[in-house]
């Protein structure tokens, strides 16, 4: 438990360093930068709430640890997490105690980084993979799928066309991810 608290504290300290770095690296005209900007920390872990949605309706939700790490000479970040499996929402709008998503989801993306004059950082995906595999390795039972979802394969599926956009502001990571294979948007928020 103390290790997790230490990691969170170190993440916050590094975010303050990042914000300080960004404010000193603004252009003289103080306008948004058009190019990529360096990121000051090699690796950051975030405890986030992940919420898959269909047409703005929450389908499932859970907490998970995601990682941002610098790449391409610190001008891009790699965003990734593995084996997320949140609890499903019931018809009454509450999270189920025992019904979980039929798939475990893993995401790996390269995000371009832009520094904004308000001190925030914007992310937009350059490329990304989205993988969904059945929990416990068994094919999915059609009766356990959320209404409106018919995956391309009940034994699991993946795509290299996933996209994401988002921001990092005042230590809050917020991304909207689209697998581009299902009519799903996945909200990733470190400040819920």
Per-range role (PLM):
Residues 2-3, 20-47, 175-192:
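Bacterial Sec-dependent N-terminal signal peptides
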Residues 45, 59-157:
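Predominantly extracellular/secreted and cell-surface proteins with exposed
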Residues 42, 71-73, 167-169:
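Solvent-exposed loop and beta-edge segments used for protein-protein assembly and interaction
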Residues 2-13:
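Bacterial N-terminal signal peptides that target proteins for export
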Residues 104-110, 116, 157-192:
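Edge beta-strand at a domain terminus
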Residues 37-64:
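N-terminal segment immediately downstream of the Sec signal-peptide cleavage site
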Residues 11-21:
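Bacterial N-terminal signal peptides
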Residues 13, 24-25, 34, 50-54, ...:
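N-terminal compositionally biased, intrinsically disordered segments and leader/signal-like regions
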């Amino acid at each position: 438990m103390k290790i997790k608290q230490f990691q969170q504290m170190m993440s916050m300290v590094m975010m303050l360093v990042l914000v300080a770095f960004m404010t000193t690296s603004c252009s003289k005209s103080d306008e948004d930068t058009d190019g990529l900007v360096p990121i000051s920390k090699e690796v950051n872990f975030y405890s986030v709430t992940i919420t898959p949605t269909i047409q703005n309706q929450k389908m499932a939700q859970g907490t998970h640890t995601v990682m941002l790490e610098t790449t391409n000479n610190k001008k891009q970040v790699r965003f990734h997490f593995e084996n997320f499996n949140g609890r499903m929402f019931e018809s009454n709008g509450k999270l189920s105690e025992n019904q979980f998503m039929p798939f475990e989801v893993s995401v790996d993306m390269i995000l371009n980084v832009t520094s904004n004059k308000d001190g925030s950082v914007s992310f937009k995906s350059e490329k990304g993979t989205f993988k969904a595999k059945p929990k416990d390795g068994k094919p999915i039972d059609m009766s356990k799928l959320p209404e409106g979802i018919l995956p391309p394969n009940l034994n699991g599926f993946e795509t290299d066309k996933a996209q994401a956009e988002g921001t990092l502001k005042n230590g809050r990571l917020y991304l909207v991810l689209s697998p581009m294979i299902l009519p799903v948007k996945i909200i990733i928020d470190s400040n819920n």
